[in-house]
Amino acid sequence: MRHLHFGKLFFVVFSLLLACTVSARKPIKTLLITGQNNHNWQVSHVVLKQILENSGRFDVDFAISPEQGKDMSGFVLDFSPYQLVVLDYNGDSWPEETNRRFLEYVQNGGGVVIYHAADNAFSKWPEFNKICLLYTSDA
């Protein structure tokens, strides 16, 4: 009987410790990239941020690109502070430096979520299409 009570006590203590550990996790630092899209990005990026942050698991920053057709050369992003990048973007090509940094981020284990039309963003960029699982050697 004594072992049964010890087992129950151990289970309760372990469960409480586990619950405290789970609730004490730091939010996932997230970069949401937007600014150009064939859909209403002005609304979608705000809603995406609300959904993510309301879960209590994400801390979301925005990177908003220049308007479509404008100079993109200054749109150079630092992905290093982020565990996750969410793309709500379907527009002009990024500068080569941003492309390089993005690929490096992914190759080093950075997380990526491609939201809706963002899978069409860079059809002529094979590495991006591989990230989206859209690339075939015949394409």
Task: Set out the residue ranges of the language-model regions.
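Bacterial N-terminal signal peptides that target proteins for export
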Residues: 1-10
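Short, low-complexity interaction segments enriched in Ser/Thr/Pro/Gly
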Residues: 5, 22-26
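Bacterial N-terminal signal peptides
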Residues: 10-19
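Helical hinge/lid and interdomain linker segments adjacent to catalytic or ligand-binding clefts
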Residues: 25, 29-122
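Cysteine-nucleophile active-site neighborhood
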Residues: 125-128
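Metal-dependent phosphoesterases centered on the DNase I-like endonuclease/exonuclease/phosphatase
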Residues: 132
